[in-house]
Every structure is written in C-alpha cells, then in structure tokens.
Amino acid sequence: MSDSTGRINSKASDSSSISDHQTADLSIFNGSFDGGAFSSSNIPLFNFMGTGNQRFQYSPHPFAKSSDPCRLAALTPSTPKGPLNLTPADFGLADFSVGNESFADFTANNTSFVGNVQSNVRSTRLLPAWAVDNSGNIRDDLTLQDVVSNGSLIDFAMDRTGVKFLERHFPEDHDNEMHFVLFDKLTEQGAVFTSLCRSAAGNFIIQKFVEHATLDEQERLVRKMCDNGLIEMCLDKFACRVVQMSIQKFDVSIAMKLVEKISSLDFLPLCTDQCAIHVLQKVVKLLPISAWSFFVKFLCRDDNLMTVCQDKYGCRLVQQTIDKLSDNPKLHCFNTRLQLLHGLMTSVARNCFRLSSNEFANYVVQYVIKSSGVMEMYRDTIIEKCLLRNILSMSQDKYASHVVEGAFLFAPPLLLSEMMDEIFDGYVKDQETNRDALDILLFHQYGNYVVQQMISICISALLGKEERKMVASEMRLYAKWFDRIKNRVNRHSGRLERFSSGKKIIESLQKLNVPMTMTNEPMPYWAMPTPLMDISAHFMNKLNFQKNSVFDE
C-alpha cells in the first residue's frame, strides 16, 4: 500500500533512483574538453592527433559526390595497409601513467577502460585455433571425439559457445563409451570439477551430467560435492544450480546424502543467502520430511528463527516451510509434520511481537494469519496472545500495521468482535487531548489503513458480500460498528479532508450511504445478509431477528 503519506510495502524494492543521473555534470557534452568534467579527474586526456603542430595534422582524402546518395567517393584511393600496431607513444602517451601504474598495467587492471575496445571479441576466445573457422565460429565438421583427442575438453567446457557444442553432442546413452570418457575427464580432479561448477559456462555441462547420471555416477558426484566445499557451492551463483539439479534429479536416497552433509555443517548462511536459499527451497519442496526435519528444529530456537525471518530471503523460506508442514493432512506422514509445525508455531507465537515489527519478518506472521485449514488454530492463538491488548500500538507501526489489517480481515467472529471493542472502548482517553484510540488511528499515517480495513469489513457484511451466512444479530453488530465509525468521521470531516488518507476514509463510508439502525426492529432491506433480489419481502418479514449469536451482548 502506498499513498502521499509515504507508506510503502515493507518488502524492499530493487528499483533504483534516477535522480543522480538527472543532476549529473553534462559539461563533457558541451564541445570543450578544457576543465569541466575532466579537470579534476584521473582520466587521461589523449592527444589522438599527435604531438606535432596542428597544421601537420592528418587530413583525410578529398571526397566527391557518389552515385549512391548515401555515400561519398574518395578522389584518391587509399592504399591497403597492414594491421596497425600502435603503442601509447603513437598517441603522445609515451610517459603516460596513472599513479604508480604504467599504461600497460592500467589497461590490464581496469577492464572497463578496454571493455569497449574489446567488445567485438567473440565468445570463442577460449577455444583453440584449430577448432574455429575463419569467421571465429566452431567448425561444422568438428566432432566430440576431436575435442577429446586434442585435449581441449576443458577449454570447450569453460567457453560459452564451446559448452553449447558439448551440450548438443552430449552422449545421453549410458552405453556410449564417450559418456564415461567425458565424465571421468571432467570429474577426476576436484579443482577442475569445482571450477566448472562455479563457471558461468561450465556449470551447464555439469548439470547435463547430473541430469543423465547413472546411480554409480550420482554417488561419485555427491562425493565430489561433499569433498570440495558443498556450502561454498551452495553460496555460489552458478554452482548452486548444480546442487539444485542434483536434489531434483538424483535418486532420493542419494540426494538425502547431500542434505545430510549440509545438516552437519554451519548452514545458517544458507538460510539468508540469495543463491543458497534456492537449494533449501528445493530440499523442502522435493524431499521427504525426514530429510529436512533438522531444519525445522533449527528454526524452533528463537535466535535462529529471528535471524532467518528478519532476512529478505529467509522469510520466504520460513513461509514455504510452514506451507509444506501444513499441507495435505491425508498423507501418512502428517502426524510427524504436525508435531514439527506445532514446535515452529510455538516459537513464532512466542516472538510474534518482534516478528510483526520487522521489515521482512512481518510477512511470516501475516502468512500464518491468512492461512486456512490446520493453521487456523495458530492464527487464533497469535491474535489472542499477541495482538489483543496491543492493537493500538501495533497499528501505529509501519510493519506491524500490516499484521493488524490481516487479523481484522481473517479473524473468526468472536475474535473480530474483541478487536473491534478494543478499538472503540478498550483504551482510556488521553487526558490532555481527550482523544481515544479511534481518533488517534484516524489521523495516523499507518493507523488510518487499519480504520479503512474496519470500514471495508463492515460494508462487505452489510452488503451481503461475506462468504458465510450471518444471522440478523450479527448484522446489527456490523451496523453498530459502521455507525460508530461514521459518526466519528463526520465529527472530524473538516480535518480529515486535508489529507489524502482522510479523503479515502470519507469516500469509503459513502459506499454505504444509508442511515444505520441499532434497534431491535426488523432489519431494513439493504442490511440483509444476502442480495435483496434473491429474497422476497414476504420471507424477510417472517425472519426471527432474535436468534442467539456469538456477537450478542
């Protein structure tokens, strides 16, 4: 949510501001290189016209009008010359240096300086000359056997174009001798295997082996990963893809050995890393609960739970874990999952207030409140033990206010009634300002969203938009809540109209612009729990409006 008050969603945005570009110094474009953007920088001013007198500067051949309207023809044909082998001295840079670096060192250590010059170099730069044609492309007649026999397999695997060649010619048939030759050469040395996994190109050929490995090869690959820094592989941008593919494609018993190795190490960094988080998500999603029960027990400890939930990536992992634990109660392992879920939810409820006030952890509490099925009992516990008696303070917090909104929306009738009563009558008025909780929230930058949610709930009920069918006594209670909010808004309408949030509150109340009733008289047609066109007036007059309800006072 956002409005002019500056409230934004608590999830961090990845977009960047362009204000820096709008105020950038554009003197470099004014046609003068004296001073300006270059006067105080370390960027060298190259004299590409030579060091001699300007009257001896190079002059191009004169041109005449060509038959082609888009071209000019040279009067004096130029003589073809060999490749130019220029040095810094040819540009007046014989004594050029940056700090203590020579020109050669400067260009070697500053790839951005030479990046534009070398941008036309093909991706086949790592391939041997015999493997490419005159255009720099891989030869059409090249075979996989040629690559292996010439000892260029690693060169191809580390090259973007070369690895595509290997993937196209990969021998998927386990009976093919070349399959075993490739596997042995790429995995026999731990350093080579690790380098390929961490390479932007090489990881693809390793994934290919993972996908088509025999059971024996799967065992060997698992040993290679465990012996060559499994945690580091999970944290790497490219190697983590190999681990994910292994969990997805390997036999379950073999994949569980990878997870067992992770559980024996310090895997807390994996829970908060942008790359490693995908590995753990694969584990939770694809493997049986017995493989990752250690992770749930790890989260049940308060310090670990707070560390993971307060991370932008970790909070999503916790949500997925809760979802998997509460999923499909008909499975035979549900009792085990329910025990682990109960331990995790106990820890969440115990730290609910701190979690709700955090930028990312509040999403975990929201997720519990919005879940259904077996999670409803934990939703009610969180509302009763954490939110009640703290609604006013939490509604004024940037992140906890999201939790309060969700609680109003998903609370069962009895708890919803208690929450409404707390806002209306649960706090002593301020002695100096004579303001109660509703007055405070109406004008608060975050609390006003809670009031808007209260209004929305009342309107949905009174217009018959609620999924469940409500009795008349419940409808009267919703009408009473709506009437109290409307009277308070009317009292402060002059001040509320000064703010965009106040205008939204006034507009939302106008959606139900009909006088309220709080008497025991039969309900008016507009307040019936179902659409009027579906109910006859004769049926409504016979309704008994005095049925008992959990809302009856």
UniProtKB/Swiss-Prot annotation:
Tell me which UniProt keywords the record has, alphabetically. Answer: Cell cycle, Cell division, Cytoplasm, Developmental protein, Differentiation, Oogenesis, Repeat, RNA-binding, Translation regulation
Tissue specificity, in the record's words, reads: Detected in differentiating oocytes with highest levels observed in developing ooctyes in the distal portion of the proximal gonad.
Kindly list the GO molecular function terms attached to this UniProt entry.
mRNA 3'-UTR binding
List GO terms (cellular component aspect).
cytoplasm; nucleus; P granule; P-body
Summarize the record's disruption phenotype note: Production of viable embryos and predominantly normal oocytes with a low percentage showing misorganization. Does not affect germline development in adult hermaphrodites. Impaired repression of glp-1 and fog-1. Simultaneous knockdown of puf-5, puf-6 and puf-7 results in abnormally small oocytes, disorganization of oocyte nuclei and cells, inefficient yolk uptake by oocytes, embryonic arrest with impaired eggshell formation and cytokinesis defects, impaired repression of glp-1 in late oogenesis, and mislocalization of rme-2 to the cytoplasm instead of the plasma membrane.
Q: Where are the Pumilio repeats?
A: 146-184, 185-223, 224-260, 261-296, 297-335, 347-384, 386-421, 432-472
Among the GO biological process terms of this entry, one is:
post-transcriptional regulation of gene expression
Q: Where is this region: RNA-binding?
A: 499-514
- Annotated compartments: Cytoplasm; Cytoplasm, P-body
The keyword Metal-binding appears for this protein: no
A single Pfam family it belongs to is PUF
Extract the SMART domains matched here. Pumilio
Q: What is the role of this chain?
A: RNA-binding protein that binds to the consensus sequence 5'-CUCUGUAUCUUGU-3' in mRNA 3'-UTRs and modulates mRNA expression and stability. Functions redundantly with puf-6 and puf-7 in oocyte formation and organization, early embryonic cell divisions, and repression of expression of glp-1 and other maternal mRNAs in late oogenesis.
| Protein name, entry field | Pumilio domain-containing protein 5
Organism of this sequence: Caenorhabditis elegans
